[in-house]
């Protein structure tokens, strides 16, 4: 699980510019497949071989006064408690404001490292504007420029050294790890409580791997499932959409750890942009996904609405066209047992492994049926393919011009794999390399490393 770093600062200090600067250090975030909603609330960053998730709080505070409201501070406290480091950004041009002083005092109780960034300092000559900030006696103070990159490398060197080492997820005895995610008040807590209250279930709480989190093991029909970080979900609370954005940190951490994301959407309200954004989080992290259309007992004209709802999901979340959907009612228990039948089916595909010979036969038939296109006057030649991971199934194909493979032909090859293997309910990762040879797992991008288990060539 990657460390999480949170950016704080008053409006217009350049948080978003700095955010974009840092996240561009790893430009190809995941797949180039069209249709993935990219909410710039978070991004993945790599520096000197260290990966971490960066969360931008820019959309949380509309003005300085928001910060001082008790319920806002409570939510910021929660975000900081979940973070492994905090960046407080100042405006080097306008100097210290009352907001900055209050924010510094607020962060004195933070248990994680705090880095103070004086932004808009783009040259050594402009560092004179940082004098009043250095006069505050702050440790970890850095003059930087999000727009031009000045000072960013020095700051990043110290930041990654302060982050906790990423520890591998402990073995879960072959339990399927589940994360229940969704927008506010969609029924996450109700579903968790319904699952844990079902008959014939054996329930126990076990320590999670994140601070103050609790994972819950439940056994259904002899199979064990791990519900990730149920502590927050089982405490029912109604908060505004604005405040709920802080929970994105917890959502990201849960998605980093899970095999399958159970994405709840509201049958009454329909598919919203926020639903698609959360689905995008899960897709980018390579999770198996199941849409749970909740509150179906309250929906009017159910049969007619079901087809419309599924069509909307397919239209707005094209990148998750493989994800099954089922209508449920967490409140009444309607079809809740059906969820676990789908989980088992998705997980079987999520951990699918294919022999190298069979995989290459699929590629041979696909490229023979639809000839590869040209790239700069030369036809693409697909030499060899190998599965390098499961969870999700991840493949690398060696081709003479990797950058010349258009997303449409890549999609065609993925569909060929789906068609011939029956993998219609799992994400599939396909990457291209120029030269065949030994797979260097250390050099893979984060999106390529999402697979839970490496596979040997057969």
From Swiss-Prot:
Any single biological process term in GO: ribosome biogenesis
Gene Ontology MF terms: GTP binding; ribosome binding
UniProt cross-references to InterPro entries, sorted A to Z: G_ENGA, GTP-bd, GTPase_Der, KH_dom-like, KH_dom-like_a/b, P-loop_NTPase, Small_GTP-bd
Residues annotated as binding GTP 2: 182-189, 229-233, 294-297
Binding-site residues for GTP 1, renumbered to this chain: 9-16, 56-60, 119-122
KW Nucleotide-binding (keyword) present: yes
Signal peptide feature range: none
PROSITE patterns: G_ENGA
Domain KH-like residues, every copy: 352-436
Keywords per UniProt: GTP-binding, Nucleotide-binding, Repeat, Ribosome biogenesis
Coiled-coil features, chain-numbered ranges: none
Ranges for domain EngA-type G: 3-167, 176-351
Family: Belongs to the TRAFAC class TrmE-Era-EngA-EngB-Septin-like GTPase superfamily. EngA (Der) GTPase family.
Assembly mode: Associates with the 50S ribosomal subunit.
PANTHER family, per database record: GTPASE DER
Record's function text: GTPase that plays an essential role in the late steps of ribosome biogenesis.
Protein name: GTPase Der
Organism: Desulfosudis oleivorans (strain DSM 6200 / JCM 39069 / Hxd3) (Desulfococcus oleovorans)
Phylogenetic placement of the source organism: Bacteria, Pseudomonadati, Thermodesulfobacteriota, Desulfobacteria, Desulfobacterales
